[in-house]
A protein has these predicted regions:
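N-terminal signal-anchor transmembrane segment
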Residues: 29, 35-101, 117-126, 414-422, ...
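Interfacial loop-to-transmembrane-helix boundary motif in multi-pass membrane proteins
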Residues: 58-60, 108-115, 151-202, 412
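Helix-loop-helix junctions and helix-breaking kinks within/between transmembrane helices
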Residues: 73-84, 123-141, 229-237, 254-285, ...
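Transmembrane alpha-helices of multi-pass inner-membrane enzymes
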Residues: 90-94, 412-421, 428-473
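Alpha-helical transmembrane segments of multi-pass inner-membrane proteins
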Residues: 166-189, 213-267, 274-285
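A membrane-periplasm/extracellular boundary helix in multi-pass inner-membrane enzymes
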Residues: 184-186, 284-324, 343-346
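Hydrophobic transmembrane alpha-helices and their immediate junctions
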Residues: 293-295, 382-420
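Long extracytoplasmic/lumenal interhelical loops at the membrane interface
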Residues: 314-386
Length: 473
């Protein structure tokens, strides 16, 4: 028998090789539906479709919250004054936890529990006094509302932050079209009717907000709220965030920027313009001189064009209104701090323990005896109800959520501006959860991970591949 290559008739893999003792076995195709035997105790295999669906659950739950705080922000839990965003936020927590993509942030949990303990202590002290009874409903809402902010996603899902931003952009495109359409039909002479107020029972929607009002006193044209936003100011702030996010994405899509800008002007709201200015300044600082020069040039051209329109004249008239008592700017940026400072001056116990949950709004005779128009931002309202020491603990908790190891410092500073300055956000789930989505939900565990695993917003155009978490140092 001739030798096979490899020398001395030996098989290269070891041992002798004998043709006479080998034979070919027939090739048999596996039976249809055949599954390999499963080891004892091993989990049953999942169909591919179910596996793919399970992978989408975490992002789908986040998308649900985005839709709720934008297109459904006017809806309440039936029979209450609580936004539907509150229960949906807990659905998000369940969806993330079910796929193992949720993690409690130790620092946030500690600060939250400290704020809860201090708030309860202040409430007990105030309840024992002779002042008005605190609202335990308001206290309970405060404690429950901020529970989700103690959590963040794990690194595997954190890499999907660009996709979350892109989904937010698409939803806000709908809101922008609604704002432009709402203004266009009024300019065409068609009377505007709020279909929510007309056809929905008041037990399903908020009725306490100024949903629509004229662009100036006596005007037949109403400011645009996009039909679905609580107020024009809400619409303008959400649109300003969308505008800045679009600048941060690769592939600017100038049509989107134009639409967001037009919708922002249709709201005729100064808070959105102010928030847009904050975002542009932060981007200018972070991106350097060349980008800043282009941004200044573009801003100047747009400002000149807007100044030639009626909207420009209306916005110009509002630039100095913060010094005018009774104006919207004064009620938001000046009056709250004057009112709370005056209350502390008349009763020193307000500085230490506050007046009690909900009393800033209910005890008007004490806090606002002059009857000023006041729109309380989060911090002065919290000080008036729980005192300065507790407010400092709560402030540390919120700043940790909004600014610590967040995926985008620009969005973090914008979220802080919305929360602390531009809105009465303390008990507003829509605002609180928007800020959390843009910052703390996708924050890194440590500062080193932010630098080492920086989320690239350019990948929002093409969804990134899932990556394994970086090994611990």
């Amino acid at each position: 028998m001739p030798e096979r290559p490899g020398g001395d008739g030996a098989f290269q893999g070891g041992g002798s090789f004998d043709d006479s003792r080998t034979r070919l076995l027939p090739v048999v195709a596996p039976r249809a539906g055949y599954a390999p035997p499963r080891r004892l105790g091993a989990p049953p295999p999942q169909p591919r479709r179910i596996a793919r669906l399970a992978e989408r659950v975490p992002l789908a739950s986040v998308y649900l919250l985005i839709v709720t705080i934008t297109l459904f922000q006017r809806f309440v839990v039936p029979g209450t004054v609580v936004s539907v965003a509150l229960p949906v936020a807990f659905v998000v927590l369940v969806g993330l936890a079910a796929r193992g993509q949720l993690k409690a942030d130790v620092t946030r949990v500690a600060l939250y529990l400290a704020a809860v303990a201090a708030s309860l202590l202040c409430t007990v002290v105030v309840s024992a006094g002779s002042g008005p009874a605190p609202s335990f409903t308001s206290l309970l809402l405060l404690l429950v509302l901020y529970i989700p902010l103690c959590f963040r996603v794990k690194d595997r899902l954190r890499d999907q932050f660009p996709r979350v931003l892109e989904f937010y952009q698409r939803i806000m495109l709908v809101g922008a079209v609604f704002c432009v359409l709402q203004t266009a039909i009024q300019l065409a002479g068609v009377g505007y009717e709020d279909l929510f107020d007309t056809y929905l029972p008041p037990t399903l929607i908020f009725t306490e907000y100024n949903t629509t009002y004229p662009i100036y006193y006596g005007s037949p044209i109403l400011k645009a709220n996009g039909f679905v936003f609580l107020e024009p100011s809400f619409a303008s702030q959400f649109l300003a965030i969308a505008f800045i996010v679009q600048l941060m994405l690769d592939g600017k899509r100038w049509g989107r920027l134009a639409l967001f800008g037009a919708a922002l002007l249709a709201t005729v709201s100064g808070t959105g313009i102010a928030l847009l200015g904050v975002g542009l300044v932060v981007l200018a600082i972070r991106r350097g001189g060349r980008w800043t020069a282009r941004a200044i040039t573009a801003t100047f051209v747009v400002a000149v064009a807007v100044s030639l329109t009626p909207v420009g004249a209306l916005l110009a008239e509002r630039t100095g209104e913060s010094s005018t008592s009774g104006s919207s700017g004064n009620a938001r940026f000046v009056a709250p701090y004057v009112v709370i400072a005056d209350a502390i001056g008349r009763d020193e116990s307000v500085f230490l323990v506050g007046r009690g949950a909900g009393t800033v709004d209910s005890d008007v005779g004490f806090f606002n005896p002059q009857g000023l128009l006041v729109n309380y931002p989060a911090l002065p309202k919290f000080i008036g109800e729980y005192g300065v020491p507790t407010a400092l603990v709560f402030l540390a908790f919120i700043l940790t959520v909004l600014l610590r190891n967040v995926p985008s410092p620009t969005l973090g500073l914008m979220a802080a501006t919305v929360y602390f300055v531009l809105s009465g956000s303390l008990l507003q789930p829509q605002t609180v959860y928007l800020c959390w989505l843009l910052t703390g939900l996708f924050a890194a565990a440590r500062a080193g991970e932010v630098a080492g695993r920086r989320v690239r917003l350019s990948s929002a155009v093409e969804p990134p591949q899932w990556r394994s978490p970086a090994p611990p140092p």
